[in-house]
């Protein structure tokens, strides 16, 4: 939700 906003990954 910070970098991978499109993926929305927990990492």
From Swiss-Prot:
Its main location: secreted. It is found in: Secreted, Extracellular space, Apoplast. The keyword Manganese applies. Keywords: Apoplast, Manganese, Metal-binding, Secreted. GO terms for cellular component: apoplast. GO terms for molecular function: metal ion binding. Oligomer (believed to be a pentamer but probably hexamer). Belongs to the germin family. May play a role in plant defense. Probably has no oxalate oxidase activity even if the active site is conserved. This is Germin-like protein 4.
């Amino acid at each position: 939700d910070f970098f991978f906003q499109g993926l929305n990954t927990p990492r």
